[in-house]
């Protein structure tokens, strides 16, 4: 089960930026190295003053990235649902019921009475949700005890199965539907290239757009498997139950998904890219490198402070602040006579600075992330509506709009509370309400209008 998270480093960085932005402070005097770079005696900068323009910039930044995040999520969610609906409408394989069911749903719904069917569907939903809960707990325990290799092997095998086996079934049914002749050698070559490139992009390194495309395709394939092999009533009950479980797992203090997110925040680590759709690149092999770089870059700072503290008594004893005649002659030889003129100040300001540039990870840290499970169940709801609503496009479009509205509200709450929130409850609730209302009220009403040739 997946949740809507922003990166932990983004939260820590934003909190630190907000705290420093709204706190008045006086900068410390520059060190001797900075004095020699500037070529001027040190001057204390004026204290920072909080103005209304800075608060306006904060609000503008929030609105900018909030709207940007909405667009970043609308496009992949829409593409995933479009792939599923297009497959349902064109490939009859995923709508035909051949009696096969998942091993997690052993009870059949082709019973004599409605009561037995409802009971069997509830039992199937309970078993399915129990399996999801157990798998989530196993994942959290493995992550808690840093069993990263086991998690990577687990995700590697799952993606291997999806990209090769389920993709082979999907491609074969598409070719059969459109009557495309294909030999086994060419088909094997296509599947091999598709699967290998996908495994490289997801578990190692690749272009961002290609990684996102593979994650969307994996979610669509999984949603199609659920649509075909889950009984109808069981599927609707699972959608309702999974939204409740997602709410509890993320918001409860001891919820498994909340523990997973908080653990990642404490360790300043990114969640595995095979579990999360990210609007920015997440590479597994870069995680250790980034942490090592941060650790290495943090060591010289206290060392430099120690040097400054050790040199301070000597500078005070000489009573010249380090501006010896030899130093003045050297600076005059390089810069000319030091006169406080407009030309000299402009030349000094144009001199290159030896300070390292600020890290360029700010835009990447702002990337919004959505669990692949959310993609799967969104697409499952829309695909199930398209498959069981007697081919009615009104019901399908109603579910599609309901999911996007729920996603907007979830992102709005995310901007307000600024913490990890579940992405399923609002969208799935809206989708279920819109589905049953449209299928049982709107569609019969419109059919009667069409029969009597009555136009509104």
UniProtKB/Swiss-Prot annotation:
**Top-level taxon:** Eukaryota
Q: Does the record carry Endoplasmic reticulum as a key word?
A: yes
Task performed by this protein: Catalytic subunit of the gamma-secretase complex, an endoprotease complex that catalyzes the intramembrane cleavage of integral membrane proteins such as Notch receptors and APP (amyloid-beta precursor protein). Requires the presence of the other members of the gamma-secretase complex for protease activity. Plays a role in Notch and Wnt signaling cascades and regulation of downstream processes via its role in processing key regulatory proteins.
Its signal peptide is: none
* Domain statement: The PAL motif is required for normal active site conformation.
Give any single GO term for biological process: melanocyte differentiation
* Description of how the protein assembles with itself and partners: Homodimer. The functional gamma-secretase complex is composed of at least four polypeptides: a presenilin homodimer (PSEN1 or PSEN2), nicastrin (NCSTN), APH1 (APH1A or APH1B) and PEN2. Such minimal complex is sufficient for secretase activity.
Membrane-topology annotation of the record: Multi-pass membrane protein
EC number(s) given by UniProt: 3.4.23.-
UniProt similarity note:
Belongs to the peptidase A22A family.
For this protein, the parts annotated as crossing the membrane are 71-91, 122-142, 156-178, 184-205, 210-230, 238-261, 370-390, 397-417, 422-442
How is the protein modified post-translationally, according to the record?
Answer: Cleaved, probably through autocleavage.
Looking at the record, which segments are called Disordered? 9-56, 332-365
Chain ranges on the Cytoplasmic side, renumbered to this chain: 1-70, 143-155, 206-209, 262-369, 418-421
Q: Which residues form the active site?
A: 246, 374
Q: Which InterPro entries match?
A: Peptidase_A22A (IPR001108), Preselin/SPP (IPR006639), Presenilin_C (IPR042524)
GO-annotated molecular function:
aspartic endopeptidase activity, intramembrane cleaving
Residue(s) at site: Cleavage: 280-282, 287-288
Q: What is its main location?
A: endoplasmic reticulum
Gene3D superfamilies according to UniProt: Presenilin
Give the residue interval(s) assigned to the motif PAL: 422-424
Put simply, this protein is called Presenilin-1
């Amino acid at each position: 089960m997946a949740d809507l998270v922003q990166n932990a480093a983004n939260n820590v960085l934003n909190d630190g930026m907000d705290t420093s932005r709204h706190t008045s402070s006086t900068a410390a005097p520059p060190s001797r190295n900075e004095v020699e770079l500037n070529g001027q005696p040190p001057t204390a900068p004026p204290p920072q003053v909080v103005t209304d323009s800075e608060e306006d910039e904060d609000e503008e930044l929030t609105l900018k990235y909030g709207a940007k995040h909405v667009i970043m999520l609308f496009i992949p969610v829409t593409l995933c649902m479009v792939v599923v609906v297009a497959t349902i409408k064109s490939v009859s394989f995923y709508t035909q019921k051949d009696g096969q069911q998942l091993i997690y749903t052993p009870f059949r719904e082709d019973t004599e009475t409605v009561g037995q069917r409802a009971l069997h569907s509830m039992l199937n939903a309970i078993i399915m949700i129990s399996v999801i809960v157990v798998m989530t707990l196993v994942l959290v325990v493995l992550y808690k005890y840093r069993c990263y290799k086991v998690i990577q092997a687990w995700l590697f095998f799952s993606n291997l199965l999806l990209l090769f086996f389920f993709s082979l079934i999907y491609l074969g049914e598409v070719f059969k539907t459109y009557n495309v002749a294909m030999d086994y050698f060419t088909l094997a070559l296509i599947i091999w290239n598709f699967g290998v490139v996908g495994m490289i992009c997801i578990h190692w390194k690749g272009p961002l757009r290609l990684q996102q495309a593979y994650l969307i395709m994996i979610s669509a394939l999984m949603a199609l498997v659920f649509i075909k092999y889950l009984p109808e009533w069981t599927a609707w009950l699972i959608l309702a139950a999974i939204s409740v479980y997602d709410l509890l797992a993320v918001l409860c203090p001891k919820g498994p998904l909340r523990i997973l997110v908080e653990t990642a925040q404490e360790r300043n680590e990114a969640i595995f890219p095979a579990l999360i759709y990210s609007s920015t690149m997440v590479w597994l092999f870069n995680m250790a490198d980034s942490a090592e770089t941060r650790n290495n870059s943090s060591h010289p700072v206290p060392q430099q402070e120690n040097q400054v503290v050790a040199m301070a008594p000597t500078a005070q004893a000489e009573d010249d602040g380090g501006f010896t005649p030899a130093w003045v002659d050297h600076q005059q030889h390089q810069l000319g006579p030091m006169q406080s003129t407009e030309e000299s100040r402009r030349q000094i300001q144009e001199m290159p600075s030896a300070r390292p540039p600020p890290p360029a990870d700010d835009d990447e840290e702002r990337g919004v992330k959505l669990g692949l499970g959310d993609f799967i169940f969104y697409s499952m709801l829309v695909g199930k509506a398209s498959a069981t609503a007697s081919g009615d496009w009104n019901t399908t479009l109603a579910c599609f709009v309901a999911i996007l509205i729920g996603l907007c509200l979830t992102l709005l709450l995310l901007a307000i509370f600024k913490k990890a929130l579940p992405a399923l409850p609002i969208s799935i609730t809206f989708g279920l309400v819109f589905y049953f209302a449209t299928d049982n009220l709107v569609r019969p009403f419109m059919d009667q209008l069409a029969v009597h040739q009555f136009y509104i």
